[in-house]
Amino acid sequence: MATGTPDSQARFGQSVKGLLTEKVNTCGTDVIALTKQVLKGSRSSELLGQAARNMVLQEDAILHSEDSLRKMAIITTHLQYQQEAIQKNVEQSPDLQDQLSHLLK
């Protein structure tokens, strides 16, 4: 810098010091904002991971429920066959009782 009065050099130094202070404050604010954004992104990632885990658990529960429903349908079919067989036996019962009483006479 060219020679100048000590007063102008002091003002220039103060001006530079003020600009540096402003830049440092701006950088500090930017770092804080960036840190908040990173933390928010990190939390979003955690929430997304938890949502994925919950979805897998729900999918497993749905598959288990479907399997249970298939088994229940098979059991229902078997019970219907048994009910039909019992119904036929009940319908034939009076005929058998009549035959038995006729034989015992």
Swiss-Prot record:
Protein name as catalogued: BLOC-1-related complex subunit 7
Listed InterPro entries: BORCS7 (IPR032143)
Pfam families on file: BORCS7 (PF16088)
Subunit and partners: Component of the BLOC-one-related complex (BORC) which is composed of BLOC1S1, BLOC1S2, BORCS5, BORCS6, BORCS7, BORCS8, KXD1 and SNAPIN.
An annotated GO BP: regulation of lysosome size
Protein family membership: Belongs to the BORCS7 family.
Cellular component terms (Gene Ontology): BORC complex; cytoplasmic side of lysosomal membrane; lysosome
Keywords of this entry: Lysosome, Membrane
Keyword Flavoprotein in annotation: no
Main localization category: membrane
Subcellular location: Lysosome membrane
Keyword DNA-binding: no
Function recorded in the entry: As part of the BORC complex may play a role in lysosomes movement and localization at the cell periphery. Associated with the cytosolic face of lysosomes, the BORC complex may recruit ARL8B and couple lysosomes to microtubule plus-end-directed kinesin motor.
